Every structure is written in structure tokens, then in C-alpha cells.
Amino acid sequence: MPRENQKRGRRAAEKAEKDAAKRKREEVPEDSLPKRLKPSTDESTEINQGADYIPFDENYNENYDGNYDENQADAPAGDMPFYGLLDPEEQEYFSRANEVLELNQFQDAEERRIFIDSVYKEANGKELKIACSQGCSRLMEKLISMSDMRQIHRLFNKFIGHFMNLVQHRFASHCCETLFINAAPGVTQKVSKSKSDKMDVDEEEGEEPEPELSLAEMFIKVVEELEGNWGYLLTERFASHTIRVLLLVLAGEPVDVSANDSVVASRKKEKLGLPQGETQDGDVSAQKRSVPDVFEATLKKIMKDIVSVLDDTYLRALATHPVGNPVLQVLVSLELSHFGKSSAKDPNSITRRLIPDESFEEGSETTTFVRGLLYDPVGSRLLETIVRCMPGKAFKGLYKNFIRDQITSLARNITAGYVVLRVLERLGKDDLQNALERIVPQVPSLLERSRMVVPKVLIERCLVRGVDTAPLARALEEAYDKDPARRLEQILRLESTTQEDLEESEQKPKGANAAPSQSSTGEKLHGSLLAQTMLTAPGPISGLIYSSLLAQSSESLVKIAKDPTASRVLQQALTVPTSSAQFRRQFAPRFTSHLKELALDSSGSHVVDALWPATKDIFFIKERMAQELTQHEMALRDSFVGRAVWRNWAMDLYKRRRGEWAMKAKGIDNNNGSGERPKSRIELARAKFAAKAEEDAKKGAQKGVTA
């Protein structure tokens, strides 16, 4: 007889018991108090009221079942209120709405607006449930990002009175953050009625009263709700990022979540809202805004309250706290840049309490604290902010007494090196020259350790300050292979990528994902950025890259062009001002007979686009490339990136009106927008001679009159 299919062993039995307990928890309503449950298969086990409460554990489920207690005032002070669960039908509707917004297949903006209005009507009275729902909170974020100011105003009013709980919630905190960012531009605006409200004002009169408070007053209400809890919220896992946004909104500073150096949110944060290419009011979140005067007074009070409840020891401990450090960065940057660097002289200011001694003498308390931040992965980010924003006098003391003598060893360190970059950005010409002389001997070892960002920033600052880059060019040449072709492979990490691919294909088991390692991807990115920066420097530094590009074969160039990271170097080499006509005359023909392959590739198509401006003064090469593209018209039209290349090269104009295309290819039709042919050298000389003759004639006439 066939044996019953059973899993044996202690682990299988424990897993079966856990699954059974999980099913029972889903079927039976739990207590509405959000306590941390101990893993147990015994249903009779209960947690005592005196047990330690650890909020927002990783395994904590916000959407627990239970009845919503209307009288929240009688609830214990430390409890998180439960706003209820969505019905299965409601969850299904909002999930479908989320999918529709994600696909974004609306015919126009008006159709999307009507759909958003219908979702808001369905969500009326359920806003808090949706914000706290694991499955539907993303829909709330999308709705807020796509809403007009009137809808944001109404939603903000629904959240008033609940912000203390919402900002600490795993999912609702992100909705609060999105709400603050999108409501910020409206603090100085009068909310006008939208089209849908004007159309439905007769049919649905009195459906929902307009909020009495303005958006500015609502922000003040939020601050009043959170008042007295700042010290706790700074290090609260979910509330801290919302507090950062609130502080920046009150200051009128840009709140750009997408920026790489943003302290508002992690780089891994999911980008929700309008599709790419569509923005509301020109991406106002990344711009500075004017705010009411009451905001500045409120911000000062918040910062004063935060500092007053923290002693110096705890304040310095925040500098290395993973959650508290970003908030401290915002506070320091606002104190030094928004309120002026003179505010740092106040003995009770955050900067002064962190760094009481501006002389940075060896052995002092300040020096010990700064040295600890230098080598700490979290604390170094705060030190970067301090270096970027601190007053000039304090920066000079920091550089001369602490960093200058050890800048070489600091640049070699993977953590302290980023602080060195911020220091280099503030140095004057003489100090930068001195720092360059100290760092240049270490360039080969830096490149060997893949610390390519230090030479990159050195090149950029030398160009800005007018410092000679010849010593740096010699150091870069010595660091890489003498063979120009091999040099480019080493800079872009092409050879290491090929070896890794071969090893992975041999060693990886079948079915494993062939994802590149994060370290190799980062090295390739930094190598590409270094090469692009080298191309912007006139002289021997850019010559290292140009000679390497000319030494590559056509097959190698095609491989580089199809690499998403390395292809940027080719685009830069074709369009940067240091690219000479002689180089482009030799380099551009290397891509002929490969244009179809490149035009159909997502990365290579950008290189083909860059060939259009690069061949402006070598028309015969551009015409040869256009003929090659014409031969593969159907293949290009069947591809999304191919159609973009066809359009950017104006190939329809090439086929129908060859003469107009030739004028456009030579840049004639873009001459001051007049459509006139640019004058040749002989014509310019004639015009200059005629102007001089006319000027001499006028002078002769004036002399005759005076005589």
C-alpha cells in the first residue's frame, strides 16, 4: 500500500503547530490591545498586563481584528487606538483602484481626476482605516500625490486629532509624510473649488462641509498634538521620518525624497504618486517655498523644546543613533543655514552643545567627539552636515588643527573619506593646492581600494578653484596600465565584470538568479563617474580617456555602449566641450555598421542619440549614418527605443525633404531661431572690414567738421 505523505522531524512538527495556531488567530478575534505576543502554540497562554511593551516589533501586525472603541479617552495612555478593518468588499474595491492608478492607462488628466473623485467618495469616513491598512495605505499615498489642494485640505482635516498615533504607525506614517509634502505648497494659497465640486454643488449640497481651518492652521494643530513628545519621537522607528518632513515644511525648505543625499527618507523608499514625466506645479517639493511667519516662530519653539529636554550626553548619543541621526542632521542644517550661522554662537544651540570648542585642540572634549564621528558609519553623516553648514571661522579651526595633517589617512578610510569630500568642497585655492599635494601620492592606493570618489572630487574642485591638475593626471596615469585600451577597462571595471560572469556561470546552481553583486555594481558606477569627470577637465586628464577610447576596437565600443553604466562615458566623450573635432572625426565612424544593434538597445540608443550633435561639423559621417538607419527602418519602428532614435535623428524629414534635413543636420535651422544660414569665415571677414571702413569714414567726417 502507498504510504501516507508525512513530514518527519521536530522542525516539521513545530511548523505544523505554528500554522495551526496562526489559522486559529485569524479565525478568532483577538484583544484590541496591541501587545507583543510571545510565540506559543498553547491557546490558553495569556500575557499579563505588566509585561514589557515593545512597540512596532518586526512581527507586529497592525491589522489585527477587534472592535473599535469609540471612547478613546478612556483607553490607557500607552495604547495605540484601533480604527477598525475594511470589509472584504471594500478591500477588493480599493485594491482594484490601486491597480488602476498603478497602470495609469487613462486617456487624459480629466478622466484620471474623475476616477480619483470617485475613490475619495468611496473612502469617505474610512480614511483612517485605509491609512492603517497594510494593503491599502499605498493607495492612500497615491491618492494624496494625485490630489488637488482642495482634496488634500479635506483629507488633512480628517487626520486632525489623530496625528500622534498615525505618525507612529508602520503604514499610516508614510501617508502622513506624503500628506505634509503635498500640502506644503498650499499653506500660502487660498483653496479654490475644483471642477467636480462646482458641478456637483447643487446635487450634493451639504454633503461634506468645508474645513474651517486653513492648511497653515492645520500644520500648527499637528505641532500642538505632538508637543511634549519630541524627545521620544526623535528615535521612534516610524515617526522620525515624518518629523523630518514636518520640520522642513515649517522651514519652507525643499523636501525632495528622491534626492540621493536626502535626509527625509531612505534611498529604498518606494516612489509613489504621479508617473514619470508628470508633475504638479513643476515639482514643488524640490523647491524652496515662502511660509507664514507663524511657521518660523513655531519651528524655533520646536527646536528649543527638543534641545531643552535632552542633556549633552543624550544629544551626542543621538549622533550615532541610526534613527535619531537623520533628525539631528535636519536640526543642525536648519539651525546653521535657515536661521543663519550666527545662531551657532548661542550657547544653548544644538551645534554649540555638540561642538563647544571651535579651536579643536588636541585632547579636548570636542576633538574626541569629532574623531568618534569620523569613523562611525552613522555619525560621519552628521559630521558631513556640520562641515557643509558650519561658519567659516569654525571650519578653518577644524581644518587647520584637526584634518589638514591627517587628510591623507582620512581619505583612505572608507567612512572618513566622505567627510574629506565635504572638506575639499569648502577649501580655498591655496588650501586645496596643499591638500592636492598631500593626497596625490596616495591616488594609486585609493584607486586600488576602489576609492575613486576622492580623485573625482579633487578634479572637480581643482577645475572650480583654478588649480593645476597636471600632478593629478600623472598620478592617474601611473595608477593604471600603460596600454590605453587596458586602462579604460580598468577604470570602468569591464574586465572584472567579465571574469565574475564566467565564475558565476560555472559555480552557480541551476535556477539561481544571476544578479550582479552590489559591490561590483558600485565599483562600476564610481569608475564611470570618474571617467566622466576626467573628460570635463581640459588637458592631460581628459587626454587619458580620449586616447583610451581611440584605442578600443569597434566590437569593444559596442559592448561598452550596451552597458548601462559605461555607456555614459561614450555619451560624455561625444558631447562634452573638451571633445575636439579631430577626436570626433576619428571616433564617430567606429559606430557605423553597428547602428541598428545599438539603436535597438536601451543603453546603446542613447549613444546613437549623442552621435547626432557630435557629427554636426562632420556632415559626411552623419549622412552615412542616416543612410544606415534608413536601411533598418522597419526594425527601428517596431522598437520603442528604436522609434526614439528615428525621431531624434529626424529620419522622416531625411526621407521626404533631404535638403531641409541637411540644413538641420548642420545646425543651420537653429541659428538664433531665424532659419538663416550662418556666415562663412570670408563673409565674416568682409563684414568686419566693412564695419571698420564705415567707422573710419565717420571719424574722417567728424575731423572735417571740427576743422
Curated annotation (Swiss-Prot):
Belongs to the NOP9 family. Coiled coil: none annotated. It comes from Aspergillus oryzae (strain ATCC 42149 / RIB 40). PANTHER family: NUCLEOLAR PROTEIN 9. Residues 1-77, 268-287, 497-523 are annotated as: Disordered. Gene3D superfamilies: Leucine-rich Repeat Variant. This is Nucleolar protein 9. Keywords: Nucleus, Repeat, Ribosome biogenesis, rRNA processing. SMART domains: Pumilio. Pumilio repeats lie at residues 122-157, 158-193, 365-400, 401-437, 548-588, 590-627. Pfam families: PUF_NOP9. RNA-binding nucleolar protein required for pre-rRNA processing. Involved in production of 18S rRNA and assembly of small ribosomal subunit. GO terms for molecular function: RNA binding.
